[in-house]
Amino acid sequence: VEVYKHYSFDLWMTLIRSNPQYKYERAKVIQERYNPTGKSLEEIMAVFRRVDLLGNTINEKTGGQLRAEELYLWVIGLAAGTEDALNGVEPEGLYTEMEEVVLANPPMIYDTDTVPVLKSLREKAPEATFSLLSNTAFVKGRTLRKVLPGLGLEGMFAFELYSDEAGVSKPNEVFFRLLLETLEATRGPISREDIVHVGDNPIADIEGAQRMGIPAILINSNNQGIEHLLRLT
C-alpha cells in the first residue's frame, strides 16, 4: 500500500472542467466588441478552440508560458484575418473583461466524485498535504484563486502554483522544482518518493513528474478516475 505524504494535483480536467456556457459567452464578448470584420459567433468559437489547443501545445513544447492577453489578441487577430483588428485594443482591459466572463460562468467540478474523494483522502491520510500545479492558458491563476472557493475546494490546498505566475509550464522541470522548493519551505524536508503528482496529461503531468523522480498517477484521460487514489491508501 502506497501512502503518500503530499499530493500534487493538476487542475483542469483533473479536478475541474470548463463551463460550456463560458466558452459561448467569451466568444460573444469578442463578437460584440472586437469584431471589425463581422465574423459569426460560430467562427469566433472555432478560432478560440484552435488557439486554445495551439497555446497549450506550444506551452508544453517550449516549457514556457504564453500570456493570456497574447492568446486573446491572437483570437481577435485571427478571427478578423488582419492585425489591424488589434488597433486600440488595451490588453489589460481586455483581460479584465474576459475575467468577468469567467467569474459569471465559473468552471465546474470535474465530476461528482471529485470533492468527496479529496475529503476521504484527507480523512484516511490526515498528515498528508495537498497542492495544485496547474498550466494556465486563457484563465490566469489570479482568476482561478477567485473561483475555486465556490466549488467546494476552499482550504483544501496548502499552496497553489500556476504556470502564468511561475513563467514556466509543465512538463518543464523548473516548474516541478518550484513544487519541491515550495513544499520544503512550507512543510520541511520531504523525499520525492513520498510525493505523488496526479493529472490527466500523459506528457505534462506524468512524464514531467517522473523525469524529476516524483511518482505520478494518470486519471480521467484513461480508464481510471480520482477514486483510484483511495485504493492506494
Segments predicted by a language model, with ranges:
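N-terminal helical cap/lid subdomain that shapes the substrate entry/recognition surface
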Residues: 2-116, 124-126, 141
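Asp-based, Mg2+/Mn2+-dependent phosphohydrolase catalytic module
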Residues: 1-9, 17-18, 39-42, 115, ...
